[in-house]
Amino acid sequence: MPIQSSGAISLDDIHQEVGGTANSNCSINDADIRGLIDASDGANTSFNDWYGASNVTPRGLFLGGNGGSDSNVDVIDYVTIASAGNATDFGNLSNGRARTQKGEICSATRCLVAGGNGFEGGASNNANSDKEVDVVEYVEFSSTGNAVDFGNLSAHKEYMAGGSNATRGLTFGGYAGSEHINDNYNVIDYFTIASTGNATDFGDTLAAVRQSCGTAGTTRALVF
């Protein structure tokens, strides 16, 4: 449940909100604790900054996809997870895109969408162009609106797996079609979700893979 919005809170309260064990060692500059409010490393913070913070995202987002008739869509919809009902318009991606990462790359406040099959500035939305992109965009859960540029992947690719621990986001593998190298990737890219910028090399998967799914906890990510 969210941290209280008034009164005294402790570092232990914050640590437990991000999944830490009560009364265990931690620091206010730990990545998972900072990630709860998207604070950068070494930022000047106070406990009041964590008032109302929650490691549970109240909204679910659906970003882009293929709309049929060989056309990608740029629509972002959302639902309020606590209440059953139809999706509501949130905003738009910069262009129609499908085949982005499978697995969320999110913090408590921000959601990223990486790569995919789409367009880098052209007006066309025809999925038959088979053009992979390296674009990474983000939205803030708290306010509806269009996606904003975050940075770029290490290469143009689609069909990656994704995962995050609220502080760091990862993409695994992927595929580049005839537009580029026509091959699978084994590269793992990572982002610090609180800070916009390009992907950094994390390592490699055991094999070059595409169309995998990803999931992550606070300390480990799985690809399957």
What is the predicted function of each stretch?
Residues 2-224:
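Polar, enzyme-active/binding microenvironments
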